[in-house]
């Protein structure tokens, strides 16, 4: 049986996550009291109507504070039943959450006449502390639109063919912000930039003209070898420490050329020695 617990601050994308999971065969329960988590898992295990039990629940700040405090104990109880249980935590920066609430005009679950929206958002972080500390996967949705979030959720949650550590190698552009959910970040802005070649500017690191240009640059090859040597040595140690997810981010200025090229190459070579290696290009449209 597989269970995914979805949590996060209000406005971060929890409803979208449940929709994606439901569309892919998960039985979903929204706003489950954390104290009922073990009982729900037990009932799902003995339910003969579920050919392959796939269960997703959202637990967030709408819970009683006392239930959230007990979340670590509830999670241990579920996992003691030999259930593969992953905790997904979604978040976004405060300015983005404020903007989303302003656009939808929805009321924050913690807001009151005496508590501003900004205060409610900050208080929510404190309440969810026990879940944040135990999250297996954290996804920051600040720079993701609805479709990008759905794609990211499918990639990280549904393309994990077997238990073990799932590695995501992600290209990005610093001009749109660094991925705050990355575990390792490599800055490759010091490398020759195809953007300044007019004939290459409109191509990406996935296309042959850019590949041909970067593949003959000595600094690019040296950077690739150094990053690969580091990852090849240390990623197995991450896997041995029972990490469920590890995100490696490779960043250049715009996220179209150098980081894309290196991310693709690293993904190809690491897939030969590691299981569950995924590649994503955040800023390629």
Swiss-Prot record:
SUPFAM superfamilies for this protein: P-loop containing nucleoside triphosphate hydrolases
Positions of GTP binding: 60-63
Source species, domain of life: Bacteria
Cited Pfam families: PapZ_C, RapZ-like_N
Positions of ATP binding: 8-15
GO-annotated molecular function: ATP binding; GTP binding
Statement: the UniProt record of this protein carries the keyword Flavoprotein: no
Keywords, in A-Z order: ATP-binding, GTP-binding, Nucleotide-binding
Family to which this protein belongs: Belongs to the RapZ-like family.
Cited function: Displays ATPase and GTPase activities.
Protein name as catalogued: Nucleotide-binding protein PSPPH_4154
Species of the source: Pseudomonas savastanoi pv. phaseolicola (strain 1448A / Race 6)
Lineage: Bacteria, Pseudomonadati, Pseudomonadota, Gammaproteobacteria, Pseudomonadales
């Amino acid at each position: 049986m597989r269970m995914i617990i979805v949590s996060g601050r209000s406005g971060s994308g929890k409803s979208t996550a449940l929709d994606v999971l439901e569309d892919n065969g998960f039985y979903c329960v929204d706003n489950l009291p954390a104290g009922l988590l073990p009982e729900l898992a037990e009932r799902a295990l003995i339910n003969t109507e579920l050919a392959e039990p796939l269960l997703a629940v959202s637990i967030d700040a709408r819970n009683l504070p006392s239930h959230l405090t007990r979340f670590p104990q509830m999670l241990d109880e579920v996992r003691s039943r030999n259930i593969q249980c992953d905790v997904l935590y979604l978040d976004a920066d405060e300015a983005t959450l404020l903007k989303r609430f302003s656009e939808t005009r929805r009321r924050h679950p913690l807001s009151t006449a005496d508590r501003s929206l900004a205060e409610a958002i900050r208080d929510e972080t404190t309440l969810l502390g026990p879940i944040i500390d135990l999250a297996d996967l954290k996804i920051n949705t600040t720079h993701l639109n609805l479709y990008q979030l759905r794609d990211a959720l499918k990639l990280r949650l549904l393309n994990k063919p077997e238990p073990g550590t799932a590695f995501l190698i992600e290209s990005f552009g610093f001009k749109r912000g660094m991925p705050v959910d990355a575990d390792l970040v490599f800055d490759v802005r010091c490398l020759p930039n195809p953007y300044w070649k007019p004939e290459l500017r409109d191509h990406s690191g996935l296309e042959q003209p850019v590949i041909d240009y970067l593949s003959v640059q000595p600094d690019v090859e040296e950077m690739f070898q150094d990053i690969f040597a580091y990852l090849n040595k240390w990623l197995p140690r991450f896997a041995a420490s029972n990490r469920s997810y590890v995100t490696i981010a490779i960043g250049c200025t715009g996220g179209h050329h150098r980081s894309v090229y290196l991310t693709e190459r690293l993904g190809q070579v690491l897939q030969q020695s590691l299981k569950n290696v995924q590649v994503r290009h955040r800023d390629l449209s």
